[in-house]
């Protein structure tokens, strides 16, 4: 049930339309899945998924799920990064940006990662996705989700928007601000959204949203586009927020929210929600509960100037090529090191080092002298780690063998083109593995990002009992993979890694992700 403040406000704004607009089609919260173009097409997914699906009106890659008992986290395709489970109208904002391969894209408030996964799919592995989350625990969830989705070209930050604005002025071609909001569109989905709601919260979120929008304006390049979205109905956070932003930033114009897509959904904005400021509400978009979603607001803003030219497919901008070359040189210098093995490196050290590795690897990309160790780092010099990766890649991932690699302790990273900054980076590129007990051991992200390129695969299907066995952490019978490391797939999509010996696949699926 909505709060008294919410109902009184909305009845005053909507009058007789209140009951109609807030009349949801069902008593339970809407549920949906969005298919990743990094894996497949919506049609192929629908044909294989064995779900009760209906096409979503909010996104061409999304479906509404009509199964009350559906548990997305247990579906093998979820583990394979084929789809992301999200409320249907939440999938509507990312496509409005019109992202194209080769662009630099920022998701400024990205956790848990649903919209970032959509942006990554639009980039198709080309260009750069920077996904930021200010809250550390949520940033870790964001990193895990983007790894599961197999995103190969992401930088994951745990930063304040103001620091990003200072470090990367006019850097991005596209920016998404899915702002922290009062969550009025979450009332049916999360009871805590009701208990925490208040007029004071709305005011607080509106002030925070304004600050974040100002930071987004600073990092957007001339001619770039910004999409602002919320899952609330509060005027101060929606139409009023956009109107106030345009007053502060005359270099921006309000564009048609649907200008980058060839379909329509939802409704226009509301003229009595602008706080008395001028705004063409026909250009913004609202989704009401009666329209099949829990509620969303979106606006698209364009910065004055000429958009930067995009690089040719498979190529980089000149400055991006320089950043990659710098990363490669940093890797070569690390590879020439004569570091001594560290003794007394026990399991507790390994767990701690692995947590630090995701932070430290990017410092290696920036050419800094850090001493962060990855699991097993005490057992190999940088030169040995790089040589072990190249030997491993030549056998199992030949397409990756010649890519620039950065050595950090015992870990190896395939970097992305990103300039040197002091920002807190959790991951920049794909952390492919480390040397342990004298041998190269691949990371889970290597298989999710590049599993389709692996030369040795154990091929499962959705109905194969071995699929659930693998996801549960058990050994399975090897039928298609030869001895050695392999990528375990389901219907051709990568689940994770394993190692074949004696006709069995030893399970290397991460324990934290396994089915219980």
Please give the residue ranges for each predicted region.
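S-adenosyl-L-methionine
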Residues: 132-170, 177
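Helix-to-beta-strand junctions that scaffold the AdoMet/dcAdoMet cofactor pocket
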Residues: 123-124, 220-222
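Polybasic, low-complexity RNA-engagement segments
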Residues: 1-48, 304-516
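Conserved class I S-adenosyl-L-methionine
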Residues: 102-111
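Mobile active-site "lid"/loop adjacent to the S-adenosyl-L-methionine
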Residues: 137, 174-214, 227, 231-239, ...
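Short beta-strand element of Class I
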Residues: 126-130
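Conserved SAM-binding loop of SAM-dependent methyltransferases across substrates and taxa
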Residues: 112-125
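Class I SAM-dependent transferase core
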Residues: 54, 58-99, 142, 500, ...
């Amino acid at each position: 049930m909505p709060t008294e403040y919410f109902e009184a406000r909305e009845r005053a704004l909507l009058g007789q339309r209140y009951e109609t607009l807030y009349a949801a089609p069902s008593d339970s919260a809407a549920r949906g899945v969005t298919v990743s173009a990094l894996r497949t097409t919506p049609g192929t997914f629908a044909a294989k998924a064995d779900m009760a699906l209906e096409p979503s009106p909010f996104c061409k890659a999304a479906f509404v799920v009509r199964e009350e008992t559906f548990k997305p986290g247990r579906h093998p395709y979820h583990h394979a990064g084929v789809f992301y489970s999200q409320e249907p109208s939440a999938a509507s904002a990312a496509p409005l940006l019109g992202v194209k391969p080769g662009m630099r894209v920022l998701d400024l408030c990205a956790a848990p990662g649903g919209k970032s996964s959509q942006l990554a799919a639009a980039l198709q592995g080309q260009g750069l996705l920077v996904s930021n989350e200010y809250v550390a625990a949520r940033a870790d969830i964001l990193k895990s989700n983007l790894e599961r989705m197999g995103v190969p070209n992401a930088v994951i930050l745990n930063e304040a928007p103001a620091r990003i604005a200072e470090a990367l002025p006019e850097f991005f071609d596209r920016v998404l601000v899915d702002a922290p909001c009062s969550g009025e569109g979450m009332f049916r989905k999360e009871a805590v959204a009701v208990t925490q709601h208040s007029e004071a919260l709305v005011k607080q979120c509106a002030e925070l949203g304004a600050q974040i929008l100002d930071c987004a304006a600073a990092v957007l390049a001339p001619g770039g586009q910004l999409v602002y979205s919320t899952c609330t109905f509060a005027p101060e956070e929606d139409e009023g927020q956009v109107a106030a932003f345009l007053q502060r930033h005359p270099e921006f114009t309000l564009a048609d929210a649907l200008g980058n897509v060839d379909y329509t959904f939802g409704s226009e904005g509301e003229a009595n929600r602008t706080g008395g400021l001028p705004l063409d509400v026909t250009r913004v978009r609202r989704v009401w509960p009666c329209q099949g979603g829990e509620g969303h607001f979106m606006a698209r803003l364009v910065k004055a100037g000429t958009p930067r030219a995009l690089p040719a497919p498979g190529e980089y901008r000149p400055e991006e090529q320089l950043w990659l070359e710098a990363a490669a040189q940093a890797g070569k210098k690390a590879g020439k090191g004569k570091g001594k093995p560290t003794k007394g490196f026990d399991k507790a050290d390994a767990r701690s080092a692995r947590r630090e590795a995701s932070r430290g690897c990017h410092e290696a990309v920036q050419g800094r002298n850090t001493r962060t160790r990855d699991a097993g780092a005490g057992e190999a010099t940088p030169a040995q780690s790089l040589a072990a990766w190249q030997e491993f890649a030549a056998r199992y991932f030949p397409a990756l063998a010649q890519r620039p690699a950065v050595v950090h302790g015992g870990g190896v990273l395939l970097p992305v083109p990103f300039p040197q900054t002091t920002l807190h980076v959790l991951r920049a590129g794909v952390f492919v593995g480390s040397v342990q007990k004298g041998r190269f051991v691949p990371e889970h992200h290597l298989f999710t990002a590049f599993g389709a390129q692996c030369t040795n695969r154990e091929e499962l299907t959705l109905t194969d009992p071995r699929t659930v066995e693998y996801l549960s952490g058990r050994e399975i019978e090897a039928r298609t993979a030869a001895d050695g490391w392999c990528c375990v797939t389901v219907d051709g999509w990568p689940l994770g890694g394993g190692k074949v010996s004696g006709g069995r696949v030893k399970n290397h699926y991460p324990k934290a992700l396994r089915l219980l």
